[in-house]
Amino acid sequence: MKVLILSCNTGEGHNSAARAIRNHLIEQDIDCTITDTLSLAGESLSRRVSQLYIYSTRTNLFKYLYKIGTAVSEFLEKVKSPVFLWNRSYSDRLEEFIIRNGYDVVICVHLFPAEAITALKLKGRIKVPAIFV
C-alpha cells in the first residue's frame, strides 16, 4: 500500500499531525509520503500563501476572510466558498500527482487539500479513498 499525506505549510500544527501519521504508518511497514499540497501549484505560491496565512492569523484577518467566505456561500446558495473555488483551481495537478505516483490512499490534514480532493471526487476523477483528519 502506498499512502499520500497532504498538508500545507501554514503553521506547523498540520505538518506535525502529518508526521505523526506518517511515523505510525511507517511502523506498520506502509509506504508513506508527506507533500505540501500548495507546492503542486508552485513553490512560490506555497511560500506566499504560507506567509499570508501566518500574517492573517496574527492580525485576525483570517477570521474575517473566513466569515466573508461563509456569508457568500450562505447568501448565494449555489455559489461555492471562494476558498473551495481557489482550492479546486489546482486540482488537475493534484490528480496528476496522485496518479503518476500510484497512491492507494490519500490522507488530508488540512482543509485546502481536502477541498481539492473533494472537487476531484465530485467530478469522479479519482477513485482512491480519501480521509480528512
Annotate the PLM regions.
Residues 6-8, 35, 133:
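Short hydrophobic segments within beta-strands
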Residues 8-12, 39-41, 103:
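Short histidine/acidic/glycine/proline-rich micro-motifs that form metal-
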Residues 20-100:
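Conserved N-terminal ligand/cofactor-binding loop architecture of enzyme catalytic domains
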Residues 12, 17, 74-133:
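Active-site and donor-binding regions of nucleotide-sugar-utilizing enzymes
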Residues 1-4:
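Extreme N-terminal starter segment of soluble prokaryotic enzymes
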